[in-house]
Amino acid sequence: MEGFLGVCPLLWGKGCQQCFFLYLARRMTNDLAMENVEKKGVTLGVQRFVVNDFGECTYLLYGEGGEGILIDAGFLYDEEWEQFIDFVEKRRVTISLLLNTHGHIDHVCGVGRVLERWKVPFAMHSADVPLLLQGPQFGGAYARAVKGDLRPSILLESDPKFTFAGHPMEIIRTPGHTQGGCCFYLPEENVLFSGDTLFEGSIGRTDLPGGDFSQLIASIRDKLFALPEDCLVLPGHGEQTTIAKEQRENPFFS
């Protein structure tokens, strides 16, 4: 993307600017150190894909029966998509739901590919639908990726709970980075998908339309920091962290 080094810092916090180098080093799938999942003996797989020019983290959750949920489909380039397809085909995973933490272009530029292949429900908060529809303004490959009507079929208007492959999942509303921001929490596994709300050592940027610094701080402090301290946090950019580490070391709270 033209001007990437200038655009990249606008989308997420200070700590995530390093994702540019992460992206260059590994345009590939990434196995996660899912200690919280493994030590409970549960049967849930989680795979991370670091994709597009922003080093966005797309997450695939899949159960023993092959049911899969995709969080923040950011696949932009053919090689990224082909690598993802190879992964799900080898494991016989079928996507049953597409979830989005928010509507920024780096988190939605793969939505069209997913919906074309699986024709599954697409869930996102209604407040971020305008961001989704603004995607073509980015031009180039991003405009082509989000062409057509990609409006979500499910609107996350409250804090609902549902079950995926026998595993409860909670939707936590966390406005601030965007007005429609949400995080997804697996209580049995004690794992949080934080999108661009909370990063390792940083938080999401709030100087874009719809951003609100005070609101973001409150979302993290009142909702995310209420989770167990050993909760594993899987963010939308960068490396995993824990609630305890961010309470203790994150410069916005420590």
Which stretches of residues belong to each language-model region?
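Active-site HxH/HxHxD metal-binding segment of metal-dependent hydrolases
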Residues: 76-81, 85-164, 249-252
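Metallo-beta-lactamase
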Residues: 75-76, 93, 137-141, 161, ...
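Residue-level marker for buried hydrophobic side chains located in beta-strands
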Residues: 69-71, 99, 122, 193, ...
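Cysteine-centered motifs
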Residues: 8, 16-19
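Conserved beta-strand hairpin/beta-sheet module of binuclear metal-dependent hydrolase folds
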Residues: 39-91, 183-194
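Short, positively charged and aromatic/hydrophobic N-terminal segments
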Residues: 23-24, 30
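Aromatic (phenylalanine/tyrosine) cluster motif
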Residues: 4, 20-23
